A protein has these predicted regions:
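Acidic, metal-coordinating helix/loop segments flanking the phosphotransfer/catalytic sites
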Residues: 30-50
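A short, hydrophobic beta-strand element within the central beta-sheet of small alpha/beta folds
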Residues: 77-87
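C-terminal output helix
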Residues: 108-120
Length: 128
C-alpha cells in the first residue's frame, strides 16, 4: 500500500492515476494533511510500503511530517518520497536532511510523473 499525502485533491488523483499507469498492482490510501496522515499511520492504517508526501501543506508541512515519521520507531524505515512544486535547491536539501528517501518536483505531465514514479517504485519496492 502507498500513502499519498497532499492538500490538493487534484494532485492526489494525479498521483493515483500515475501509480496505476506504472502497471504495478498497488493499493493507495490518501490523506489531505500532515496531521491526518500521522493519525492514519499511528492508529491502525497499517504500515505503507511507501509514502508520497507533499512538502507545502497548510498546518503541518511535509518537512514536519517527515521529521515525525523519522523520529517514530515504528515508522522511521518507511521510504518517503517528497513530491513538491518547489524548485528551490534549499528545499531539496532540507527534505533530504529531514530524511527524504527521494524527491520529485511537480508539476509533471502525467506520462512523465508515471515514469518517475515507476523509477521510484523500482528503487524502493522491487518486484519479488
Amino acid at each position: 500500500m502507498i500513502l499519498v499525502v497532499d492538500d490538493s485533491p487534484t494532485d492526489i488523483e494525479l498521483a493515483i492515476i500515475a501509480l496505476e499507469a506504472t502497471g504495478r498492482e498497488i493499493s493507495v490510501c490518501s490523506a489531505s494533511d500532515g496531521k491526518s496522515a500521522l493519525a492514519m499511520l499511528r492508529n491502525g492504517l497499517g504500515l505503507p510500503a511507501l509514502i508520497l508526501l507533499d512538502m507545502k501543506m497548510p498546518g503541518m508541512n511535509g518537512i514536519e511530517v517527515l521529521r515525525e515519521i523519522r523520529s517514530d520507531y515504528c515508522l522511521r524505515d518507511i521510504p518517503v518520497v517528497v513530491v513538491t512544486s518547489s524548485a528551490l535547491e534549499s528545499d531539496r536539501t532540507e527534505a533530504v536532511a529531514a530524511g527524504a528517501s527521494d524527491y520529485l518536483q511537480k508539476p509533471l505531465a502525467l506520462d512523465q510523473f508515471s515514469k518517475e514514479l515507476g523509477s521510484v517504485l523500482h528503487r524502493w519496492l522491487p518486484v519479488t
